[in-house]
A protein has these predicted regions:
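C-terminal lobe and adjacent flexible extensions of AdoMet/dcAdoMet transferase-like proteins
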Residues: 186, 204-258
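Catalytic cores of RNA-modifying enzymes
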Residues: 1-204, 243-248, 256-258
Length: 258
């Protein structure tokens, strides 16, 4: 047996050790018949050993050299790329679409999500372990304090379900926070709005979340009568649904084109 890997604080490592959580998380790859999956940060392979049993094309990306060496001894047939997921050209890893799964390091979990969004045409599904607070934020709906930028941007492209809540004892070393697994299934509909503008509108609206939209979105220079005649502009960002934000993006784009 290979020598155990010591978790490295600077990499934000908390190795999963709970077999039930690992098996239930691995089972999520069966949900939408995605043929290929990439695991981020397999560590010592507690989740990985369930994934390699699945009838899928499977690869892993791991930044920690010690973990890569451990996996090479324990799972010699597993293809592990020693690299930083955030700096990896993930489009070149498979010949077609693939899902993303893993116990995501909490200090970069939002960055991982944004990379998935950037490659959403290639990534039809993802399943990840997040800090519970972040997971709830991603899954949150409007009129809720936890509803924010991540909620809207992710839910515009993926249907989100919060699958499992996980206690700190499921990890080594145990984190100081609760965790959760969320699953995202891509929404298969045509994106008929300006995505770059949509991101800008959402981020701008929530950066001043206590202000009404008529004040928070001043930088877009909408005509005053548009703001006065549309009830949406009397609301705050947290009151708008994802579809409201898409409609708002259409409206702003329409007036920018005039």
């Amino acid at each position: 047996m290979a020598k155990q890997v010591r978790a490295k604080k600077f990499l934000g490592q908390h190795f999963l050790r709970d077999e039930y959580v690992a098996e239930q998380t691995a089972n999520l790859v069966d949900r939408d018949a995605v043929p290929s999956w990439l695991e981020i940060g397999p560590g010592m392979g507690v989740l990985t050993k369930y994934l390699v049993q699945k009838p899928i094309e499977f690869k892993a990306v791991e930044l920690d050299r010690d973990s890569v060496a451990y996996l090479a001894k324990e799972m010699p047939s597993l293809e592990v790329l020693e690299a930083d997921f955030l700096k990896t050209d993930i489009e070149s890893l498979f010949n077609g679409p693939f899902g993303v799964i893993g116990n995501f390091p909490y200090n970069i979990s939002s960055q991982i999500l944004f990379k998935i969004l950037d490659h959403r045409q290639t990534v039809p599904a993802f399943a990840g372990m997040f800090q519970l607070e972040v997971a709830k934020r991603i899954a949150s709906g409007p009129n809720n304090k936890t509803y924010g930028i991540l909620s809207v941007l992710v839910q515009a492209f993926y249907t989100i379900t919060l699958e499992i809540e996980i206690p700190p004892t499921a990890f080594v070393p145990p984190p100081k926070v609760q965790s959760a697994v969320i699953y995202g299934a891509r929404i298969e509909q045509e994106v008929d709005w300006n995505v770059k503008l949509f991101f800008d509108v959402v981020k701008t609206a929530f950066q001043q979340r206590r202000k009404t939209l008529s004040n928070a979105l001043k930088k877009f220079n909408l005509p005053k009568e548009v703001c006065l005649n549309n009830q949406m502009f009397k609301l705050r960002a947290e009151n708008l649904s994802v579809s409201d934000f898409i409609g708002l993006t259409h409206l702003i784009e329409q007036h920018q084109a005039q």
